[in-house]
A protein has these predicted regions:
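Generic intrinsically disordered, low-complexity segments enriched for polar/acidic and small residues
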Residues: 1, 236-237, 285, 293, ...
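Glycine-rich phosphate-binding loops at beta-strand->alpha-helix junctions
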Residues: 275-284
Length: 345
């Protein structure tokens, strides 16, 4: 999946950018990146975070980077943000995307003229670089972003950092979210709305499907109005999203309670306890327990200090290992009992 966070401030933005980006660590464990713009132009840092958390890897960078605007990301695959120099000028870009027609887009760009892409290990093309190439096909950034949203088969939500501000664009069907927060002297742009709560921001707006906004120190301006065709990914509520998040005004935690309650109404089993598999299964189990009246218990404990979410690695054997090692059973709560176990709905 992946997630991102951006800041436009009248003051230095690094504190908010660092912690806001870190609050997206549940969405990816592959790479993290920060890009900022200030008096000295653009600066960027990208690190592998597979074996060390985002905060540890970027603590030194944050002390050295300076700027009043910036974007950061947690990526589950390609390195980003990228800094791109084109006829639009220089900009930094980060994306949350799933592009199904990469080969067709690449060939179309090749057919239109001289172009090249840098291959990542394994021969894959960086999807964020491909999005930048699509944007650069048009005469201005707004038309370029619209063209990218329309051309991609799959999903694309992005942030683009320029010397003037941050352009934010939501997937044309709203599959993935993008939210703007506000506080005195600053705006933020984020995938997860809870990411700005502890930083002092309050809700400003949630972009609609295909909406493009530009955020500057002076305010937020809508450049392309939202469409009406909403097809948001429901797995955000069921699994990907953090419990304290909300999408389209619907709380993740409350949605999981309701899903568990619906299961309880459907079932006719009578277990001794209801249990959830951490992390997302816990709230489903709580909802089931509340509705059924059957006690909730925690016979499966996740070892949170070191084990990440098991869906992140691309190698199945690694996913199997993490899934096995991260959960520790409490045998005293399991032995001789009938269980109703919720993994996720």
């Amino acid at each position: 999946m992946g997630g991102f966070f951006g800041v436009v401030s009248k003051d230095d933005c690094l504190f908010d950018l660092f912690f806001g980006t870190d609050y997206h660590s549940h969405l990816g464990t592959r790479r993290g990146g920060l890009a900022v713009y200030g008096e000295n132009g653009f600066d960027r840092s990208i690190h592998n975070i597979e074996n060390s958390p985002f905060r540890t890897k970027f603590d030194k960078d944050v002390q050295e980077m300076k700027g009043n605007m910036g974007i950061g990301c947690i990526s589950d695959y390609e390195p980003q943000p990228l800094i791109v120099r084109s006829h639009h000028g220089t900009y930094a870009i980060t994306t949350v995307s799933k592009i199904n027609n990469i080969d067709e887009i690449v060939q179309d760009i090749f057919d239109k003229g001289h172009a090249h892409f840098l291959e990542m290990s394994g021969g894959d093309i960086n999807a964020t670089e491909l999005v930048a190439a699509l944007i650069n096909q048009k005469e201005n950034l707004i038309d370029g972003i619209r063209y990218a949203l329309e051309t991609i088969d799959g999903s694309l939500t992005l942030m683009l950092l320029t010397p003037k501000g941050i352009y934010a664009a939501r997937d044309k069907y709203g599959r993935t979210p993008i939210v703007i927060g506000q506080k005195e002297n600053a705006y933020c742009v984020t995938f997860e709305d809870f990411a700005y709560r502890n930083l002092g921001y309050h809700d400003y707006k949630e972009l609609g499907p295909g909406e493009i906004d530009v955020i500057t120190t002076e305010g937020v301006k809508t450049l392309v109005a939202p469409g009406k065709d909403m097809k948001i990914c429901t797995f955000l509520w069921v699994y990907y999203g953090y419990p304290s998040s909300s999408y389209e005004g619907v709380s993740v935690e409350e949605m999981r309670y309701r899903c568990g309650a619906c299961l309880a109404k459907r079932d006719n089993v009578k277990p001794d306890i209801v249990a959830g598999v951490p992390d997302s299964g816990i709230a489903h189990a709580v909802g089931y327990s509340n509705e059924s009246g059957i006690p909730f218990s925690r016979p499966f404990i996740k070892y949170t200090p070191t084990w990440p979410r098991s869906f992140m690695p691309t190698i199945q054997s690694q996913r199997n290992l993490i899934a096995k090692m991260k959960l520790i059973a409490v045998h005293e709560l399991i032995k001789d009992k009938k269980h109703k176990v919720e993994e996720k709905v």
